Amino acid sequence: EDAMFILWKDHSASAEAEEITEKARCFTGGNYLEYSGGLYSAEWYWAKLLHLCRTNPKLAEAAESLVEHCDWITGLLCGDTGPARIARSRCAAGHKALWNTAFGGYPPKEFFKTLDPRLSRFRTGLPGETVTSDKAAGRLCPEWASRLGLPAGIVVGVGLFDAHAAALGAGIRRGTAVKVIGTSSSEMIVVAPEDLRGRAVSGIESQAEGSMIPGLLSLEAGQSAFGDIFAWFRGLLAFPLEGLLSRGLISDGTLDESIEAIIPALSEAASRRSPRDTGPVALDWFNGRRAPFANHRVKAGVSGLGLDTDAPEFFRALVYAAAFGTRAIHEHLRGEGVAVEKVVAVGGIPRKAPFVMQTLADVLNVEVEAPEISHASARGAALLAAVAGGLYPDTETALARFARAAGLEAAGRGYRPFKEARPVIETLYQKYLDLGRFIDYS
């Protein structure tokens, strides 16, 4: 049986995403993938809904609508989760559900009928308008006011995705790529419409109007796995330890401490060594590829292993893979005419993995700023709530105020690239690209 929620990370809808892409390319009524990088993703709204229709038709028949979690939460807080009345956020609809003013909203029912007639019913039930996250969705209902210990009737802002909120919490501005790094990673960028001269950026995840800052276009591209890659490797190395626990040879506490020590130990050992251009090379596609040009069926690969490859060197190859994936995205963006002049990193990884961050700076060949922000998404949500509640006239004013209050201009650590590593990194990056082409076309 299906649960109440569908996780974005689940790629069960890969076939449906590919079908949406093919149907959209053949549809004569308009190019509805124009603002989604030219490809639809298995992580997004319509692919998951189409997959649900085909795998659980009974539930699909009973369902009134599919609601993004960030929209459902605001409805819950306001005391009304009726799908027709929930404020649908520009962020969710614009980045994941094909909503755009150029289309007059969502694609028409005729488009969805080419995929499955049941989708047209869900399309009919969606409101025509979406709301930017600097606006009020409603007011806090008595039930949740009591649960949260807050006054009933205070403003509840329209929701948005965590990475977009984190980018605002990090003080995003034009020319800056905010890299939100955790289990996965997202590159968040804002540009003025005139910067693109009416063009859509191909090969990224999506671009949406005003999903972070009203009046600016928000671009999103990222990696489906980042921290998850290192967690996977840690799990491989921890397997014998878990066997010792089952045989009573090690305690729970000792096991937990030992597992927690694996990544720091690997990082320390790898940081003491100079990289070699004959070492192993890995891909970061452990959970498919988001960008450039999404493909959630591809898998990671590794080449160049030898009997002299030890755990720290293998770990370094995985760290390079994650960094190379970021570089490929940034190079693609620049090739599309998008300025990336500065990189700011927030999330769990920047705060606890200096070796990973230094490698990222070396690979990107730019300084990577890591401000001291422990809860960037919460900070961004608070910023928008302050605008929705009338404390600031607009998002950009709130951004400037929050940046000054938090000292974002000076706080945190900057990772500068080591120039000595450039020749080896360039060789390894070309091998990364070659391995990627081989896996892509295999």
Labelled PLM ranges:
Residues 1-18, 58, 80-82, 105, ...:
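Glycine/Thr-rich phosphate-binding loops that ligate phosphate moieties of nucleotide
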Residues 13, 51, 74, 165-167, ...:
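Hydrophobic side chains within alpha-helical segments
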Residues 27-158, 283-287, 315, 319:
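Gly/Ser/Thr-rich active-site cleft segment
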Residues 63-66, 153-155, 175-178, 186, ...:
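Beta-sheet entry/capping signal
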Residues 141-150, 160-176:
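Conserved phosphate-binding catalytic cores of ATP/NTP-utilizing and phosphoryl-transfer enzymes
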